[in-house]
Amino acid sequence: MKTSDFDYNLPQEYIAQKPAEPRDSSRLLVLNRQSGELKSCIFRDITGYFQPGDVLVMNNSRVLPARIKGIKQDTSAKIEILLLKSDGNGCWEALLKPGKRTKPGTIIDIRKQDGQIHIQAEVLADKEDGIKLLRFSDETLLMKLGEVPLPPYIHTPVSDPERYQTVYALTNGSVAAPTAGLHFTPELLERLGDMGVICTYVTLHIGLDTFRPVKEEDPSDHIIHREYGILSAETAAAICQAKANGKRVFCVGTSATRLVEQASSLSQNGIIELYSGWADLFILPGYKFKVADCFITNFHLPRSTPLMLTAAFAGWPLLQKAYEKAINEHYRFYSFGDAMLVL
């Protein structure tokens, strides 16, 4: 298995620049792993694939206003900060743009446009993959100074930043949205609940790996970034009950899937339990899924870890056929694009 196996060509015009309106009007490509059938429909019709007692697991992490603009104190040059992860003590891992010439000791002034809020960031150290360690003079003001970061391939401003949040987003912590969940509306979730589907939530704060291509020739050499996650006792109980009753677990997105699989792999008896901690499970083809029975996801970037997880779940040959069909039928790709359901 090589990283180049997960490459494909996508015309730029297929990259969705705006979200579907309404959310559940996006297209849905359904992959049946047993029959190999590929079927197109509208996302709101996904209800037809659920049965009473099935469990739907969603990631309720909320995207931080992690994009912050500042000015380097020594040169007055503009600089952009993308917050990645806090250490809980006022320091953050971050990406700087431009960043190569920004050395430890650099002071960055950050002001709100009205000038009423002013803090400073000091670059403390260089880390791997171009990441910098920053210390802020007042960490409590960061959320008032930033804006929600959009992926680098989206060039059209979004009029409503909430369109890059799921309708059930709750806990701040991600630098990218769990995009498979962007298709759900409150009404669609209510319909699923009325059908007897158990809607549950986990929290996994999404980091850099969502956009970062795997550069190693052998994907198993890639070190995935750790992301903090919480799986509650209530969600664990719902999953266990579904399994005991012969019902299915539908995971929404690669983040929810990784967290439930990590929690299962760390339990002594293989039964999913309450989990709180770092998630660093890198799922590649050949992995045996223990929790997820069905999988809802978007169309992912070439050579990315989410694409590799999807290939592990669907099977790469079938997934390649699905991507070919999606391109031929002008599906919309990436964060604001259409969705897939893998059964």
Curated annotation (Swiss-Prot):
Swiss-Prot/TrEMBL GO biological process terms: queuosine biosynthetic process; tRNA wobble guanine modification
Keywords: Cytoplasm, Queuosine biosynthesis, S-adenosyl-L-methionine, Transferase
Record-level Gene Ontology MF annotations: S-adenosylmethionine:tRNA ribosyltransferase-isomerase activity
Gene Ontology CC terms, in alphabetical order: cytoplasm
Main location: cytoplasm
Subcellular location per the Swiss-Prot or TrEMBL entry: Cytoplasm
UniProt xrefs under InterPro entries: QueA, QueA_dom1, QueA_dom2, QueA_sf
Gene3D superfamilies assigned: QueA-like (3.40.1780.10)
Quaternary structure, from the entry: Monomer.
Family according to the record: Belongs to the QueA family.
Described function: Transfers and isomerizes the ribose moiety from AdoMet to the 7-aminomethyl group of 7-deazaguanine (preQ1-tRNA) to give epoxyqueuosine (oQ-tRNA).
Protein name: S-adenosylmethionine:tRNA ribosyltransferase-isomerase
Organism: Dehalococcoides mccartyi (strain ATCC BAA-2266 / KCTC 15142 / 195)
Phylogenetic placement of the source organism: Bacteria, Bacillati, Chloroflexota, Dehalococcoidia, Dehalococcoidales
Gene this chain is encoded by: queA
